[in-house]
């Protein structure tokens, strides 16, 4: 019985020593993050789509903050994101490329459930977990969560996933208030 208590005491002492060493090492060798990279990453849409040429939003933010990468490469963020980045970094806004010049039409993935074999490759490819389903059962896309990054289309072995535009409703309609004519009527006061 005393051998068990000795083993428990030795393991407890070792865990305290190693825990202390790890705690010291984490403080001593801590890598300080660049605050500008954190701010850039907060502005980006976090769709992790890779359309900018980087594997996600964090590497792109690191490239913009530390390597002087152009701020107009985020296609999902569009002009709004580019203008916010320009204001943050105190640089001139850069014109978007020809393909990003117009506001991109929002598309979401759509799965033809009749042809879905339930292989789960699309679920594994989705960076935001917008696809639900089970193995060997049909899958479906949660359109409110889907960012339209198009990463789920290529892995599908049956080609049952396609990108479809989001239907325009009153909830997602973008009103162009600058084209609505406004006429100011002056009211005369009679005193």
Curated annotation (Swiss-Prot):
The keyword Ion transport does not apply. Binds 3 [4Fe-4S] clusters. Residues 107-136, 137-166 form the 4Fe-4S ferredoxin-type domain. GO terms for cellular component: plasma membrane. Residues 32-91 form the 4Fe-4S domain. Keywords: 4Fe-4S, Cell inner membrane, Cell membrane, Electron transport, Iron, Iron-sulfur, Membrane, Metal-binding, Repeat, Translocase, Transport. It is an enzyme of class 7 (translocase). [4Fe-4S] cluster 3 binds at residues 126, 146, 149, 152. It is found in: Cell inner membrane. Residues 1-26 are annotated as: Hydrophobic. Its cofactor is [4Fe-4S] cluster. One of its GO terms (biological process) is electron transport chain. InterPro entries: 4Fe-4S_dom (IPR007202), 4Fe4S_Fe-S-bd (IPR017896), 4Fe4S_Fe_S_CS (IPR017900), Elect_transpt_cplx_RnfB/RsxB (IPR010207), RnfB/RsxB_Proteobac (IPR016463), RnfB_subfamily (IPR050294). Its EC number is 7.-.-.-. Its main location: membrane. [4Fe-4S] cluster 2 binds at residues 116, 119, 122, 156. One of its GO terms (molecular function) is electron transfer activity. Part of a membrane-bound complex that couples electron transfer with translocation of ions across the membrane. Belongs to the 4Fe4S bacterial-type ferredoxin family. RnfB subfamily. The complex is composed of six subunits: RnfA, RnfB, RnfC, RnfD, RnfE and RnfG. This is Ion-translocating oxidoreductase complex subunit B. It comes from Erwinia tasmaniensis (strain DSM 17950 / CFBP 7177 / CIP 109463 / NCPPB 4357 / Et1/99).
């Amino acid at each position: 019985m005393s051998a068990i208590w000795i083993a428990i005491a030795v393991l407890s002492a070792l865990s305290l020593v190693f825990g202390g060493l790890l705690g010291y090492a984490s403080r001593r060798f801590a890598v300080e993050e660049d605050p500008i990279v954190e701010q850039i990453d907060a502005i980006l849409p976090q769709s992790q789509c890779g359309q900018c040429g980087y594997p996600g939003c964090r590497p792109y933010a690191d490239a913009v903050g530390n390597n002087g990468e152009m701020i107009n490469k985020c296609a999902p963020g569009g002009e709004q994101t580019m203008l916010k980045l320009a204001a943050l970094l105190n640089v001139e806004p850069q014109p978007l490329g020809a393909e990003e010049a117009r506001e991109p039409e929002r598309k979401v993935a759509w799965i033809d459930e009749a042809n879905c074999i339930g292989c789960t490759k699309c679920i594994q490819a989705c960076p935001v977990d917008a696809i639900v389903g089970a193995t060997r059962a049909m899958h479906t896309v949660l359109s409110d969560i889907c960012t339209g990054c198009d990463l789920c289309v290529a892995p599908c072995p049956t080609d049952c996933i396609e990108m479809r535009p989001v239907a325009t409703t009153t909830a997602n309609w973008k009103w162009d208030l600058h084209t609505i004519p406004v006429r100011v009527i002056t009211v005369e006061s009679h005193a």
